[in-house]
Regions:
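The feature marks helicase ATPase cores and/or their adjacent C-terminal helical subdomains
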Residues: 1-374
Length: 374
């Protein structure tokens, strides 16, 4: 079996690499976490082949799980939970009832609407729609005799797919991640591509396994070890160079954030602290400003650090938070700063294909009021 993971860096062309390495004569299945990722994949395939190849299918991960692991095996699901008359009514995106809830006084109590995972009602609404959020958990739960649903589904996928690709796999957590690992054990050919250091950046799906176990953060080396123990060949070389960021930017990210990133870019672009010209930078419409949050509150052209993920700009100014105010010091360290915050800054600092301007929080606070929309 061919099971590979390519660990990439920002701007290395993850989606480009996947879309240009496929064999259009084979039955390819390309999966990604968000609709935006799917849109990017389709565009890249059109650039590479003129259109999406006839034998290539592109879909979101949730659609994949529903179509290939849930819907075809509904009779087995009904039998597993001893609900033989069960017939589903589609799927919904509302969240299932949580196990615990908070009272008006802040007390954490058991939720009476919660149903344990050994009951079918844990996975469906009262109108018999599957909860999108528990699809992977359901797929992992069901067995027919001694054979798991996952193993049966993998055998079926091997009949109809020559290669399966999963883009931005760092976005998958908890049961989604577990399902990918378990399914991959039985697939003939699967390739995962993602950037470890872009985990915990999106607005949702930011907690838990594989990047956090209980209260402990999982470091890069431990994550690689987890993938290898699951039987994956881990490639840390193919996409280690950024096609977007200049050498100066990559070196600065490596020095300050400890992230191993190199440049494949010959373009000119420097890292410039702009505290002495802060107002001129903020007033320049050609320089996108990246802020930690509430970008819409400002008069200047701005975007939140995390929302800029996947984008490329000619030049950006990253407005730092208090914890990074001394990043220009030789003694600066990220020790004590939350991993999710470091990763969001990494995303922000790697958006520019030219100059990267950095502005201290202390500088911005002095002039901030003049730029707030009132």
């Amino acid at each position: 079996m061919d099971k590979r993971v390519i660990l990439a860096v920002a701007g290395s062309g993850k989606t480009y690499h996947i879309c240009h390495m496929i064999d259009p004569s084979k039955r390819n299945l390309l999966l990604a976490f968000t609709n935006e990722n799917i849109h990017n994949i389709r565009n890249e395939l059109c650039d590479a082949f003129g259109s999406v190849p006839e034998l290539t299918t592109v879909m979101t991960y949730d659609s994949f799980v529903y179509r290939h692991l849930i819907n075809p095996y509904e009779p087995s699901i009904a039998e597993h939970f001893n609900c033989l008359s069960f017939v589903s009514n589609g799927i919904c995106t509302i969240d299932p009832p949580p196990k615990q809830i908070s009272t008006s006084r802040g007390r954490i109590i058991a939720n009476r609407r919660y149903t344990p995972k050994d009951k079918l009602e844990h996975y469906i609404t009262k109108s018999k729609q599957y909860y999108c959020a528990t699809l992977s958990e359901l797929a992992m739960q069901v067995k027919k005799g001694s054979e798991s649903l996952v193993k049966r589904a993998a055998a079926r996928l091997n009949l109809f797919c020559d290669q399966i690709f999963i883009d931005e796999f760092q976005d998958f957590r908890e049961h989604d991640f577990d399902l990918i690992i378990e399914l991959s054990k039985h697939l003939n050919s699967v390739l995962l591509v993602g950037d470890y250091y872009q985990h915990s950046v999106s607005g949702t799906n930011n907690s838990g396994k594989p990047f956090k176990i209980k209260k402990n953060e999982v470091c890069y080396n431990d994550f690689v070890a987890t993938l290898k123990s699951a039987g994956f060949e881990v490639d840390e070389e193919t996409l280690r160079k950024s096609r977007r960021c200049t050498t100066s930017v990559c070196n600065y990210v490596k020095e300050k954030l400890g992230i191993q990133i190199e440049s494949a870019n010959d373009a000119q672009g420097e890292v410039l602290w702009c505290d002495d010209s802060a107002e001129a930078i903020l007033d320049n419409p050609d320089i996108l400003k990246l802020v930690i949050q509430k970008a819409a509150d400002y008069k200047f052209n701005a975007m939140n650090w995390s929302y800029s993920k996947g984008d490329t700009f000619s030049s950006v100014c990253v407005i730092l938070t208090d914890k990074f105010d001394n990043m220009d010091d030789e003694e600066f360290t990220t020790k004590g700063i939350a991993t999710s915050t470091i990763n969001k800054l990494y995303v922000a600092m790697t958006r520019s294909k030219g100059n990267l301007y950095l502005m201290k929080s202390s500088t911005f606070k002095k002039i901030k009021d003049a730029y707030i929309i009132k």
